[in-house]
Amino acid sequence: MQVDKIDHIVLTVHDIEATCEFYSRVFSMQVITFGNGRKALLFGEQKINLHEVGKELEPKALNSAPGSGDICFITDIPLQRVIDHMSSCGVEILEGPARKTGARGPIESIYVRDPDGNLIEISNYLVNAA
């Protein structure tokens, strides 16, 4: 069996509304409601489903906890503009720019945290990198 792509991931969070506000304001993600009032963050062809800690739907991750996520987002926006945007949103840059390796090759990344402490890497693929 071969997997083609990721459809969604799940983040367990303390406050779904605060998480929705952060990701929509900082990353321009669309907040959607589905199912029985569930919330998700839609971007590109994938989404992040949100579970409130202590109220997770079954089945759930074995050790779901706020702040346990580590996600890399790819953007075509130059990292300096991303850094400026993070600053204007009041989001601290933890590290970077730093060269890393993405799924398709070399990337340059910065790192921030969301309101629950999840590590968010924001990256550009490097063109013609050696």
Please place each PLM-identified region on the residue numbering.
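Vicinal oxygen chelate
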Residues: 1-6, 30-77, 81-113, 125-130
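Short phosphate-engaging motifs
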Residues: 18-19, 78
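Conserved active-site tyrosine of GNAT-family acetyltransferases
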Residues: 19-24, 86, 117
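Short glycine-/small-residue motifs
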Residues: 119-122
